[in-house]
Regions:
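Small beta-barrel nucleic-acid-binding modules, primarily SNase/OB-fold domains
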Residues: 2-5, 16-144
Length: 144
């Protein structure tokens, strides 16, 4: 009985596909090449021969400059936005592998995805560095 169980496990291991595994997510990972970092929250990538603009999923990053949606913008937000942009640019530039876990296409036509660099969630890294906040309905107050 034990021998049958071991044989079954061995056969199962032979047929289960092996690939990137990040957590318990049943995700599909799409390889990508960075083209241009727009800011800390958006990047142009080359994906399967097509240029796409990708917004980070689940996080909000500071804005580089004031806009109509951001009446509370201040110089501190601009400073943090530059740090976030440079952080993303540096990490994408040194990554050996970049994978996208695409969540959706937003109403502006941007792809919303989790960006993995060498198996690490780049959005989470921005959160750890205090260069992003979790994407909630609350407007982040960078200028406190």
């Amino acid at each position: 009985m034990f021998r049958i169980l071991l044989s079954s496990i061995f056969l199962l291991l032979l047929v289960v596909p092996v690939g990137p595994s990040y957590g318990a997510c049943p995700c599909t990972y799409t390889p990508a090449l960075p083209i241009e970092v727009i800011d800390g929250g958006a990047v142009w990538f080359l994906v399967e021969g097509e240029e796409i603009r990708v917004q980070f999923a689940d996080i909000h990053t500071p804005e580089l400059s004031p806009n109509s949606e951001n009446a509370n913008w201040c110089e501190e937000e601009g400073r943090k936005a530059i740090l976030a942009r440079d952080f993303v640019s540096q990490h994408l530039g040194t990554a050996k592998e970049i994978l996208l876990d695409i969540h959706e296409i937003d109403m502006n036509g941007d792809t919303v995805a989790v960006i993995y660099i060498d198996g690490i969630d780049l959005g989470q890294e921005l959160l750890y560095q205090y260069l992003a906040t979790e994407n909630t309905s609350d407007t982040p107050l960078w200028c406190q």
